[in-house]
Amino acid sequence: MKFPFTRFSLSWLILTLSPVQAEPGVFTSSADLGSVKLPGSATYNATEESYTVTGGGTNMWATADAFHFTWKQMSGDATIAADISFPEATRDPHAKGVLIIRQSLYADSPYADAALHADGLTSLQYRETKGDRTYEIQANSTKPSRLRLEKRGKYVSLSIAGESGDLEPAGGSFRLVLTDPFYIGLGVCSHNNDVVEKAVFRKVEITNGTTPATGAKPRLISTLETVPIASRDRRAIFTTIDQLIEAPNWTPDGQSLIYNSKGRLYRLPVTGGAPAVIDTGSAIRCNNDHGISPDGKTIVISDQSTPDRKSRIYTLPAEGGVPQLITEAAPSYWHGWSPDGKTLAYCAERNGEYDIYTVPATGGTELRLTDAKGLDDGPDYSPDGQFIYFNSDRTGNMHVWRMKTDGTGQEQITKDGFNNWFPHPSPDGKWLVFLSYDKDVKGHPENKDVSLRLLSLTDSGKEPEVLAKLFGGQGTINVPSWSPDSKKLAFVSYQLVP
């Protein structure tokens, strides 16, 4: 049998509450949130243990939401999972059923949701602060049989299940700081304020807290993602469990991404799919400092397969082949290729000092460009070939610097309260992306709270913008990862789960 939930109307910022009654199921209340023209509803079928939610509203997007929500309050770590279906034909492919966690019941509240759209699109959506715009991470899978939204500490993530019914990480997570208590529940938005749509949620499971097995080692989830510079809406391309992947390069034709894992290089279609190993001959301990020549014909690697296990730079054909040694001296870590394809830039340790060097792409005598005390690292060329951007801790904190390609004219670019690493100019010369750690983090370790930030190279007065906040660091964007049209960036994010 079915039981209606207590309903009340919540307009843009005004709350009107009808008499509260005891409710069945796991939720306590139900309401339309935001500017909703037609009232929605939520009912619970105790026999089938299912929830049917109808909702209107224009969207759950931008700076405010309009939908029907049924909820309970919780604190701490929490998960909510359900099978979601649309029993009737929807009038808009963007109508969606969601599993949702919200800070408040106001329309512009911070929130995160796992959204299944009527057309099968599946995504993790979020608003970081009150009144901010909504962002999303699209899963590289459609029409999953089950979704799970998980809040663990200050990170939120999505898992989905296919035909097997087994939930697996959908890839990508983001930082969302909520105070206790928060609201958790189910929602429906019709994406058309003149109609209501219906979704059924079955096998709803809500858990509070995570209890890992005694002595259990956290599992590593690596996700290769892309993000458009214009929308900032991320897309998970490829996800692995218990296998570290690092440092994607975008091929010049825009069709593939190259990354490293367990000492090997792999090529992956930019749309996702099965990765293919690239033959690197005897070089089977490739690290995360690799790239592709401007003409797309050659790959450069930094490999540690020699008996001394020190990194040296090699080149090989893009389709794979026998590596050619470029730097005899070690350790050497590649980071940049000149736009004309003739010169490689890299970080190397010589006589106890890490500095920036260049060498002809075919091998030869290396040229030292920096000699400041401390670490100079991460060199990458500007697309016009006039400058090399790099990071240096010569002033105390790690910051982005720039110099001419002969090493002269060294100038500091960033001067903020972060440690900034691995600057990469966009191919069109308009943007500089780099990785930022908190100022108290030493080095560029893995598994830290980091931000990808963008600095305009055409507006000298503009402050860096946050492109994405994630759990990452070492391996996220060590090397150039711009799409050839400068519209997107590839990177790797990580999760550690019990």
Task: Go through the PLM ranges and name each one.
Residues 4, 92, 322-324:
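Short secondary-structure capping/junction motifs at helix and strand boundaries
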Residues 23-214:
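Extracellular glycan-recognition regions
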Residues 9-18:
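Bacterial N-terminal signal peptides
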